[in-house]
């Protein structure tokens, strides 16, 4: 048997192993666009444009929120991973509208005047299938404990519950 023929079983085994691993690996799902902007009113924390960044790994759907217009008030601070954030979005699926929520406790350390960075927040309420779209839950001002689209609950060292309302739809809805 020639040297090349002896390697054929090894090459076939390696190719089958790679194909099997690829077949079992979770695939990244597309969400478009990856970023969108919307305006939020967060009372004492400020009002203005926020950037929402979406991701779909195939096993987890997330949204990260950043804003230079919405900031921690002077004299306050937050330790890393001490802010619980919940974001409500309107979901449209096959012409039917409902709500989903993204929530998490992921943030860098922040102090008074710092722009907010919240998340990534994981999908925690509702489901999203391929082709579903999500957009801001636009509500009237002022935000309150029962009237909010985005809720920020800081716990350390400053304790505060900050309800926010979206005052605009996203620049483009996310299509999952």
What is the meaning of each model-derived region?
Residues 1-30:
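Secretory targeting and sorting signals
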Residues 31-176:
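Primarily mature extracellular domains of secreted and cell-surface proteins
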């Amino acid at each position: 048997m020639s040297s090349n023929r002896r390697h054929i079983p090894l090459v076939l085994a390696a190719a089958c192993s790679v194909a099997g691993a690829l077949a079992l690996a979770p695939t990244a799902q597309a969400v478009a666009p990856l970023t969108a902007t919307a305006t939020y009113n967060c009372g004492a924390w400020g009002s203005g444009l926020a950037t929402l960044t979406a991701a779909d790994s195939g096993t987890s759907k997330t949204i990260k929120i950043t804003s230079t217009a919405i900031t921690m008030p002077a004299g306050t601070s937050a330790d890393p991973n001490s802010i619980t954030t919940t974001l409500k979005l309107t979901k449209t699926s096959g012409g039917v509208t409902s709500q989903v929520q993204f929530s998490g406790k992921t943030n860098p350390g922040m102090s008074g005047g710092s722009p907010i960075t919240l998340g990534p927040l994981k999908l925690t309420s509702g489901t999203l299938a391929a082709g579903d779209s999500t957009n801001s839950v636009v509500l009237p001002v002022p935000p309150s404990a029962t009237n909010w689209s985005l809720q920020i609950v800081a716990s350390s060292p400053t304790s505060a519950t900050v309800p926010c309302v979206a005052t605009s739809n996203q620049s483009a809805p996310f299509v999952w």
